[in-house]
């Protein structure tokens, strides 16, 4: 058999790759598990695609609604701008009309002021003539009062001299009588005191001698009895104790009797001293009356000097009152003109304030609407940005959220620091103003003009204040 020829080499079979995994070497179970995993991933991808499709439709619908609202808002803003222009035109017309009325009122007020000034001058002349007549009558009354006062002063001086002479006579008589009675009483009571003291010394000496003798005799008897009964001391101990107690009781009774006698002597001495004090009281009363009369005399002299000073001051004040009367009448006329001018300026100021409030209110409403629209636009953009970042890069979305929170916290802290600094600046400004007001009050109190402070006060209130002063001048937060 001829030899068989060699067969050519077969080509090498390539591996099958699915999702980057070689499936040629897998078993049936592995392939089934791999197929189930692929199916689950495909289902998940399909769900995500449906979810993103729904989110895209929602965003598109939301964007269309927002654009429609934006168009409506722009149309409303145009209408409001037209209304504001119309209102401004009407306000300008009203302002011109009011200014014309103010000119007419000023002209009428000027004419009325001239008439009032002429009437006031006429009344002033009449009042001046009347005041001259009253002044003459008052001068006559004042001369009569001075004459009556002079007569009363002379009469009072004469009565005072008579009373002084009579009082000096009575005082001398009372002093002589009291001095004589005092000497008699002193001599009488000194004799009684010496006699009573001698009697008491003799009586107390006799009593003490008797007590001393009885005590010595008793001691001697006790010593004799003790020597005789020393051997039988235990048998007679109770009898001796009873005898000693009886002796002590009798001695206590004697001491009590002596103490009562001493108390009677003290009472007699106290009665004598009380009688001396009773006799001294009329003399002291007379001295008190003398001092009282002397003090009344001093008061009279002081009142007399005060009366002369008051007369001089009255003359000076009358002249000053005349000058002040003329100044007051001039100031009243000037005050009337200033009051009329102030009323006109006040009405004009109120009209301007109302106009400014209306304009400011319209501007605030427009700004609030613009701010609300910008905030809504910012919220929309933030939502779209977060959704886009969450879809494309979830990790970056978490970082962005934490970054937003951190930035928000930093901004809040900075805002709080700014508010605290503004509050401190406002407190310093308030303290500066209080110090300046106190300084100006002191200058006014001492008659120094406030223009001579030596520096220019800083009172800038153009900037917006976040803190204001409360009812008691306390710095409070302006919320």
Swiss-Prot record:
GO terms for biological process: flagellated sperm motility. Residues 28-93, 117-170, 210-347 form a coiled coil. The keyword Kinase does not apply. Its main location: cytoplasm. GO terms for cellular component: Golgi apparatus; microtubule; motile cilium. Keywords: Cell projection, Cilium, Coiled coil, Cytoplasm, Cytoskeleton, Flagellum, Microtubule. It comes from the Eukaryota. It is found in: Cytoplasm, Cytoskeleton; Cytoplasm, Cytoskeleton, Flagellum basal body. One of its GO terms (molecular function) is small GTPase binding. Pfam families: GAS. Cytoskeletal linker which probably functions in axonemal and non-axonemal dynein regulation. May play a role in the spermatozoa motility. Belongs to the DRC4 family. This is Dynein regulatory complex subunit 4. It comes from Drosophila melanogaster (Fruit fly).
């Amino acid at each position: 058999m001829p030899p068989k020829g060699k067969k050519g080499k077969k080509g090498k079979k390539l591996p099958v790759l699915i999702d980057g995994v070689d499936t040629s070497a897998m078993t049936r179970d592995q392939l089934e598990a791999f197929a189930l995993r692929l199916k689950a991933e495909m289902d998940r991808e399909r769900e995500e695609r449906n979810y993103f499709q729904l989110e895209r439709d929602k965003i598109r619908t939301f964007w269309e609604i927002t654009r429609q609202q934006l168009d409506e808002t722009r149309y409303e803003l145009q209408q409001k701008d037209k209304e504001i222009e119309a209102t401004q035109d009407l306000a300008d017309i009203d302002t011109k009309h009011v200014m014309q009325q103010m000119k007419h009122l000023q002209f009428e007020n000027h004419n009325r002021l001239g008439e009032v000034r002429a009437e006031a001058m006429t009344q002033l002349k009449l009042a001046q003539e009347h005041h001259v007549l009253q002044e003459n009558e008052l001068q006559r009354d004042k001369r009569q009062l001075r004459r009556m006062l002079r007569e009363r002063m002379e009469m009072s001086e004469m009565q005072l001299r008579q009373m002084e002479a009579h009082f000096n006579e009575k005082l001398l008589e009372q002093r002589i009588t009291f001095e004589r009675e005092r000497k008699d009483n002193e001599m009488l009571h000194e004799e009684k005191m010496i006699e009573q003291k001698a009697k008491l010394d003799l009586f107390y000496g006799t009593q003490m001698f008797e007590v001393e003798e009885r005590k010595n005799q008793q001691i001697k008897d006790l010593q004799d009895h003790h020597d005789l009964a020393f051997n039988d001391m235990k048998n007679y101990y109770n009898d001796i104790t009873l005898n000693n107690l009886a002796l002590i009781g009798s001695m206590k009774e004697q001491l009590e009797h002596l103490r009562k006698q001493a108390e009677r002597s003290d009472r007699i001495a106290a009665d004598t001293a009380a009688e001396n004090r009773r006799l001294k009281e009329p003399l002291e009363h007379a001295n008190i009356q003398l001092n009282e009369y002397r003090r009344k005399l001093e008061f009279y002299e002081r009142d007399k000097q005060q009366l002369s000073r008051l007369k001089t001051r009255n003359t000076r004040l009358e002249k000053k009152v005349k000058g002040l009367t003329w100044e007051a009448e001039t100031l009243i006329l000037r005050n009337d003109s200033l009051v009329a001018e102030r009323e006109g300026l006040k009405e004009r100021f109120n009209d301007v304030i109302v106009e400014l409030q209306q304009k400011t209110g319209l501007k605030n409403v427009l700004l609030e609407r613009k701010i609300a629209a910008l905030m809504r636009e910012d919220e929309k953009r933030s939502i779209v940005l977060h959704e886009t970042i969450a879809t494309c890069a979830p990790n970056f979305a978490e970082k962005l959220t934490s970054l937003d929170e951190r930035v928000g916290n930093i901004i809040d802290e900075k805002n709080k620091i700014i508010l605290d600094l503004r509050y401190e600046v406002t407190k310093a400004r308030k303290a500066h103003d209080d110090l300046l007001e106190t300084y100006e009050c002191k200058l006014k109190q001492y008659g120094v003009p406030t223009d001579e402070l030596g520096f220019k006060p800083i009172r800038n209130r153009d900037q917006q204040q976040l803190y204001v002063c409360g009812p008691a001048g306390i710095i409070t937060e302006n919320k």
